[in-house]
Amino acid sequence: MIYRAYYAFIRAPRMNSRGENTSAIFGFVVTLEDLLKRVKPTHIAVAFDPAGPTFRHEAFEQYKAQRQETPEDIRWSVPRIKQLLQAMNIPILQVDGFEADDVIGTLARKAEEEGFEVLMATLDKDYGQLVTEHISMFRPRHTGGFEKLGPADICQKYGLQHQSQVIDLLGLMGDSSDNIPGCKGVGEKTAIQLLQQFGSIDNLLANTNQLKGALQRKVQEQVDNIRFSRFLATIRTDVPLEFDAPSLVYQERDWERLAPLYRELEFNSLLKQAPASIARGKVALTQSSKKVKAQEATLDLFATIESESNQSQSKEVGMEETQDTLEGRLVSYLLNPEVAYNPMQPIQWD
């Protein structure tokens, strides 16, 4: 969400009167505010990657090494986003040595054990491995709204027999976004065919004699690469983190703390949500803030929320994943089965 908000305004960045680029912050907050208003979550949390390396970086020096350096404006934005989250009384989760994906994987499993229905709003196909009858993906459509993906949907999409095969699929085909090598020379189509035939990487590697020609040679020569890629692609579900539901209960925002932050950032449209007694501290409408106001109206036209499932009377936990800075990911909303989508740019499922 942070990256997408930033690049949505890349041609006409949102600049406040101090010359600070607030595009990423504003796009994030607008989507979150709209989400909270319409969904009315019971539980919520936001998780970030740690500042230091994770176990994947320690195991593979080139993990995500191909990614371009994070724009300075986004780096500047992240601490302010965290300040806003704290003022909104939204817990921030972060575990040293583990990616936010692993935090979500662990929370999803623990929440499921506690009787929650878990929803993960994400574009990341890796999350397919976490899907169960009680854990679903909400994938934003590039046309707006969401597509809810359960076990059968994941299997149908990739021609798999079980959604857990997503791990082996990534182990074979690799993942260029994370610099996971996979088996060189084996793409998605071939990887799917191999899993349809053998069921798993382990069974494939135990029966390479059934392969022919160049494919047999590729697989036999890259056994270690395949197994290591599967390790890198596996989302951990054993992070040392408790699922403390009471601590994640959604609370009202602290306007005494939030309003000054909105004023400082010149988020005038968001400040209108504050109680009248707090919102009276107005900001002078400079030429810059007039431009910002127009951009806010434009973004309002982009922000959409659609429900892709019927309301459930049971407890619900939803998790949204989106990339932010410092190799971090803003990932977790724990909420009911409606999720906000901010279609900053067309997104295709990869």
PLM feature segments, named:
Residues 1-121, 125-152, 225-228, 234-242, ...:
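Noncatalytic, basic helical substrate-engagement surface that gates or grips nucleic-acid strands
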Residues 42-45, 88-90, 113, 132-136, ...:
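Non-catalytic nucleic-acid-binding/docking modules located in mid-to-C-terminal regions
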